[in-house]
Amino acid sequence: ELKDYIEKLKSLRGLQPELRSTLEGIPKTAHPMDVLRTGCSVLGNLEQEEGFLNQTDHADRMLSAFPSILSYWYQFSHHGKRIDTETNDDTIGGHFLHLLHGKKPSQLHNQVMSVSLILYAEHEFNASTFAARVCASTLSDIHSAVTSAIGTLRGPLHGGANEAASAMLSQWNDPDVAEVELLKMLTKKQLVMGFGHAVYTESDPRNEVIKQWSKKLSLEVNDKHLYDVSERVEAVMRREKNLFANADFYHASTYEFMGIP
């Protein structure tokens, strides 16, 4: 049954010419979340929902097509390439990394990306899923509901914490320097992304999982500072503010090590 489902998802990775044309018109300055939002909406026009009974098929199609949508736009807007989005990778994460880098990912990268997607799926009842449910409760179609969710996740008060954490960490090449600069940020009461959680109060169990994978990737790429800086920032935030790293924090280094822009 699992094998059949994997093969089904593989068969749904292609993009229609109309969708590819739309993606080619989006500038490279666009945020990937905006690209995904638009891609989902266009897909809903090209593959219209005829009734609630086939929503599962539409959900499978979106699972397969979203990595294709993001990667096609990225490769065309940044490198002028029109890529074939139909790979033979067994996993969604492997499919995405293959399209992003133009080659089949290593077993380690494939596994890490799958773990990452699972961890982010385990995010309880948050703003984006709530937005999707509100939209669905009006008996709107599934593409509208998912588009609503993507638009909600686009907001900085909900999504983007790993991106913000990555931007912060990239400024520091030494743990000692990172501690000094972080203390300055705290003195100025500046927001430090990637810490605390609305539901978890003592720790985020997802953080422990992704942190382990970040360390493995750090060793693989012979990282000189990013993982050590991340650990120091985590320790300082716990010491100074009694705040724990959430799932987003070590995703910053994890994605950096895998070459995800």
Task: Give the residues covered by each predicted segment.
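Hydrophobic alpha-helical bundle cores within soluble ligand-binding/oligomerization subdomains
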Residues: 1-261
